[in-house]
Amino acid sequence: MKVTSLSFPYGESIQWFSPERADSIQNAQLKDWLLATGSLTLKLKNLCNDFEVKVLGEQLTSPLATDTMIEETVWMREVLLCLDGTPWVFARTLVPQSLLDFKSQAFTQLGNKPLGELLYTSPEIIPGKIELAKFDTCSRLAKLATSLKQEISDPLWGRRRHFSIDTRHLTVSEIFLPAAVAHMKLHNK
């Protein structure tokens, strides 16, 4: 795998849309995965022997213009979720500075632990709405998939979910890489 910290961040300006417009997603299994409300981490772990989080980078930064729910400095973390050594999902987390001041250790010291375990096991964290996005084959994330030796023949699809802790919001974006989509098509899961 030729991903280095010099490549960080991969995130780009994204046009998110509501799940009501998900009819354009032809792959029914992918659509189900995109709209699933439970923990993606748990779902992925059930499909493999070795689940791994590979951190691409993390840092304090300004949010992108498309991250409208967050208007302050954010802690950004970008990772690959790998199943049996193969990257399946690119994930990007944005945690606002005010939430870091409130719960810094929970987020900044995850290391290679999946964030999903914290998000779906902590009663104070409330999952919010899901939004979807389509990434053309020339996007930065498609180039990431190519650098991971995954062939890009169709656009990539991803989802973004907002989570609330008190009055603060964090955002998690998950983009399904070609290896995940190929598995879904093959195994109908």
Swiss-Prot record:
Substrate binds at residues 77, 115, 174. One of its GO terms (cellular component) is cytosol. Disulfide bonds: none annotated. Its main location: cytoplasm. Its EC number is 4.1.3.40. It catalyses: chorismate = 4-hydroxybenzoate + pyruvate. Pathway: Cofactor biosynthesis; ubiquinone biosynthesis. GO terms for molecular function: chorismate lyase activity. It holds the Pfam family Chor_lyase. Gene3D superfamilies: Chorismate lyase-like (3.40.1410.10). GO terms for biological process: pyruvate biosynthetic process; ubiquinone biosynthetic process. Keywords: Cytoplasm, Lyase, Pyruvate, Ubiquinone biosynthesis. It is found in: Cytoplasm. Removes the pyruvyl group from chorismate, with concomitant aromatization of the ring, to provide 4-hydroxybenzoate (4HB) for the ubiquinone pathway. Belongs to the UbiC family. This is Probable chorismate pyruvate-lyase. It comes from Shewanella denitrificans (strain OS217 / ATCC BAA-1090 / DSM 15013).
